Amino acid sequence: MEFSRGCVRTCNFCDWVTSGGGFRTKTGQQVFTEVKYYYENFGVRNFYFNDALINGSIKEFNAFNELLLKYYTENNLPNRHLLYSGHFIIRGPDTGWKKSDIERMGKAGADNMVVGVETGSDHVRKSMNKGYTLADLDYNMEMFAKCDIKLYMLMMVGYPTETDNDFQQTLDLITRYQQYVASGNISGVNFGQTFVIEEGAPIFYHPEELELQGVDGKTPHDVFWINPKNSTLTYKERIKRRIAAQELANKLGYPIWRADGQLNWLMAKYQEIANGTYNEHKTRIQS
C-alpha cells in the first residue's frame, strides 16, 4: 500500500529528493478506508506501506491511527487487531510529535518501522541533512519500547565527513541499543556495504558542498571519491569500519540482513586492497 509519495526530508545522499517528486499524501481517512476494505473483504490483517515514509504528515498519520482505534472500539476488537509496517522518519518533540502520538500509533497497530538511523554521530547526521538528532532518536526509541513498536535500522558507514570519533559514536549507539534487541524492539539492522554516491542524489550533483573530489578526473560517484579534509577515510578504511560495525552488532545479537554474504564480500575486498591485488581500481584507492 501507499500512504504518500515523495518525501518531506532532503537527505543529501538519497535520490528520492530528485526522483520522488514533491511530497503529497492521502488523507488518513482515505488510507483507513483502504485498510478497512482489505480487512473486511479479504481478511487481511497485516499491511506494509511501500512509500518513502508513512508519517510525512503528522496530521494525516494521526488521523489514520485515530480511525483505526475508533473502528476497534465500534467492532469490539482489541488494540493492534490490524498491524502495519513501513518506512518512518524520526521527529523530536519540538516538531509537534508528541508522546501521545506514539502511544496512539502503538495501540492502532504500528508494528515494524524501517528507519534511516545511519549513524550515532550528530555531526555526521547534520552533514547528511537528516533533519533530526540523536536525542530525537532516543526519544522515539524509548517510546517504541513502551508501546510495543519495533524498529528496523538502516545504517550507513563511511560517510565522507565521518571521523574516527564519529564512527566510535556509531559503535557506542549499537552497544547502547542492544537493550532493545534483547527486548525485541529492534527487529534487525541493514548496514549495506559502505557509503556510495548514487546518481540522482543531491550529493551526486553538488559534491562541492562537501568539497569532495573524484578520481581519474571523474565526478565523485559510487565509492570513488575522496574528501581531502578527511583524508584518512580511504576506501580501505571505510571497509574496515564497516566490518567492525557488523562484527560488533553480531556479537551483541542483532539480526543482520544478509550478514554472512555482506561480511564475506567486505572481507574479500579488504584483503584485496591490503594485498595490493584489487586491480580494477588499484590506482584510485590508497591504503
Residues covered by each model-derived region:
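Radical SAM [4Fe-4S] cluster-binding motif and immediate context
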Residues: 1-151
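Catalytic cores of alpha/beta
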Residues: 101, 161-176
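Short beta-strand segments at enzyme active-site cores
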Residues: 46-49, 151-155, 187-192
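Flexible glycine/acidic-rich beta-alpha junction loops that bind and position SAM and/or redox cofactors
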Residues: 9, 58-59, 126-128, 157-165, ...
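C-terminal, active-site-flanking charged/polar segments
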Residues: 134-137, 172-180, 193-199
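Radical SAM enzyme core and accessory elements
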Residues: 218-287
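Short, surface-exposed amphipathic charged segments that create phosphate/polyanion-binding patches used
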Residues: 100-103, 204-212, 273-274
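Alpha-helix termini
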Residues: 69-78, 176-187
